[in-house]
Amino acid sequence: MTKHYLNSKYQSEQRSSAMKKITMGTASIILGSLVYIGADSQQVNAATEATNANNNQSAQVSQATSQPINFQVQKDGSSEKSHMDDYMQHPGKVIKQNNKYYFQAVLNNASFWKEYKFYNANNQELATTVVNDDKKADTRTINVAVEPGYKSLTTKVHIVVPQINYNHRYTTHLEFEKAIPTLADAAKPNNVKPVQPKPAQTKTPTEQTKPVQPKVEKVKPTVTTTSKVEDNHSTKVVSTDTTKDQTKTQTAHTVKTAQTAQEQNKVQTPVKDVASAKSESNNQAVSDNKSQQTNKVTKQNESPKQASKAKELPKTGLTSVDNFISTVAFATLALLGSLSLLLFKRKESK
């Protein structure tokens, strides 16, 4: 009787069951990978949409303009200063936002202010909103809707101080140092086009000033001529002396002219050297100016590229690629593990 592991039918059944296991394992791994990648891509898309929404909101927020304004809180029906003035920070602010005006004030000991209402000259209640409520510092920042031209506001408050059993309601009036001014709209940065400086025009070498060459005065040699012998009727001895004197004079004259020519050459040589040195320095200055201007132009061209790169959103797509690679690696390792386990079982069955 043949052993069961040598039976062809048993072997085919084992192969089919092994293929089923491999197929099920591979399918489960692929399905899990797809689910993981889909969830990760949804998170990435949600983060990208949130970033874009924040950028759009920040771009759509209108620029607010403000101006400080002094004020004083006075008792009702008089110009005497009220104690309420000591519980408000000075100065206040006039704010223009979305074409609406607000008077902004900061209340000290905010826990004492149980109620506060503001009215205009026509006894109409003005809308009041809380901008900031700092519990630790016990301060509260409020905005009161106003209009340009308001000079005073009527206030009705309810103050409670538990430490001294103070609980009162009273009316005061808030007097501005000047009427609420009209503020200009804030400049929108998106509509302002940056002015690019024009590069300075360089002069061509032909337009540049030529170096001034110093004028050299030519030195004319002074020749002293000896007086001719007037007396032609002198004796022979005298005539010999006269000829000697003439020859000496001529030789002295030739020596002086040669020395004068040498001095002229010496004077002209340094003048030429100075002129050539000045021309070389001018050429170097022109080349330096050109190189500096080219560097400025390249920097100006690179600055808008850097600004455009700063405005780009972060590249969140790279994280999904990394996750996909890690998932594929994990699936490959799982598949190899299942195959090795299958081979190990087959060896044990044999």
From Swiss-Prot:
It is found in: Secreted, Cell wall. Residues 187-314 are annotated as: Disordered. Residues 1-46 form the signal peptide. SUPFAM superfamilies: NEAT domain-like (SSF158911). Residues 252-268, 278-306 have a biased composition (Polar residues). GO terms for cellular component: extracellular region. A motif (LPXTG sorting signal) lies at residues 313-317. Residues 317-350 form a propeptide. It is a peptidoglycan-anchor. One of its GO terms (molecular function) is metal ion binding. Heme binds at residues 75, 82, 166. PROSITE patterns: GRAM_POS_ANCHORING, NEAT. InterPro entries: IsdA (IPR050436), LPXTG_anchor (IPR019931), NEAT_dom (IPR006635), NEAT_dom_sf (IPR037250). Induction: Repressed by fur in the presence of iron. Residues 188-199 have a biased composition (Low complexity). The modification Pentaglycyl murein peptidoglycan amidated threonine is found at residue 316. Cell wall-anchored surface receptor that participates in the extraction of heme from oxidized methemoglobin/metHb to enable growth on hemoglobin as a sole iron source. Receives heme from IsdB and transfers it to IsdC. Also plays a role in the inhibition of host immune response. Protects S.aureus against the bactericidal protease activity of apolactoferrin. Decreases bacterial cellular hydrophobicity, which renders S.aureus resistant to bactericidal human skin fatty acids as well as to beta-defensins and cathelicidin. The NEAT domain is responsible for binding Fe(3+) and Fe(2+) heme and fibrinogen. The NEAT domain is an inhibitor of apolactoferrin activity, while the C-domain confers resistance to bovine lactoferricin. Belongs to the IsdA family. Monomer. Interacts with IsdC. Interacts with IsdB. This is Iron-regulated surface determinant protein A. It comes from Staphylococcus aureus (strain bovine RF122 / ET3-1). The lineage of its organism: Bacteria, Bacillati, Bacillota, Bacilli, Bacillales.
